[in-house]
Swiss-Prot record:
GO biological process, one term: translation
Any one cellular-component term (Gene Ontology): ribosome
InterPro entries linked: Ribosomal_uL5, Ribosomal_uL5_bac-type, Ribosomal_uL5_C, Ribosomal_uL5_CS, Ribosomal_uL5_dom_sf, Ribosomal_uL5_N
Record note on quaternary structure: Part of the 50S ribosomal subunit; part of the 5S rRNA/L5/L18/L25 subcomplex. Contacts the 5S rRNA and the P site tRNA. Forms a bridge to the 30S subunit in the 70S ribosome.
Functional note: This is one of the proteins that bind and probably mediate the attachment of the 5S RNA into the large ribosomal subunit, where it forms part of the central protuberance. In the 70S ribosome it contacts protein S13 of the 30S subunit (bridge B1b), connecting the 2 subunits; this bridge is implicated in subunit movement. Contacts the P site tRNA; the 5S rRNA and some of its associated proteins might help stabilize positioning of ribosome-bound tRNAs.
Keyword annotations of the record: Ribonucleoprotein, Ribosomal protein, RNA-binding, rRNA-binding, tRNA-binding
Classification of source organism: Bacteria, Pseudomonadati, Pseudomonadota, Alphaproteobacteria, Hyphomicrobiales
Family annotation (SUPFAM superfamilies): RL5-like
Family, per entry: Belongs to the universal ribosomal protein uL5 family.
Gene Ontology terms, MF aspect: rRNA binding; structural constituent of ribosome; tRNA binding
NCBIfam families associated with the record: PRK00010.1 (NF000585)
Source species: Nitrobacter winogradskyi (strain ATCC 25391 / DSM 10237 / CIP 104748 / NCIMB 11846 / Nb-255)
UniProt protein name: Large ribosomal subunit protein uL5
Amino acid sequence: MAETAYVPRLRAEYDKSIRSRLTEQFGYVNVMQVPRLDKVVLNMGIGEAVNDRKKAEAAAGDLSLIAGQKAVVTYSRVAISTFKLRENQPIGCKVTLRKTKMYEFIDRLVNVALPRVRDFRGLNPKSFDGRGNYSLGIKEHIIFPEIDFDKVGESWGMDVTVCTTAQTDDEARALLTAFNFPFRQ
């Protein structure tokens, strides 16, 4: 008896209804023309890591908890004297999510984390880059349920970039709206 492979809820919803809705809306003739999610990039810049290397490691640990995948510490490429920054100093961390972990993260972001943001009025509908990708900033990483509020020493912000295969911003907006992204009106 063959076991069925795990399919995230949002991926199943995309295969079942979203893909056909987008095909009708934009009149695609080929299945490969329908936009889909490609990857999600989480980036956390830590300016204080210049003075204390442990802060970059702590931020990478928190980002790993949020993403469910190991985050990599990013290092400076050039020295900038005004920021007291030397070459190869840790300045942040990042992680790229694809496939199953990407769909699970987007599900947690839209349904759990964003509703926990104070004074949340919706996502900015103008944050598309012109090529079908969407970026948003989160001011406090403690809105995610994986982070224990009592054990966090500092609260950091992070950038979330959702990359899609859409050719235009309108196609990407329709795709993300179908995934229940709460855009402002």
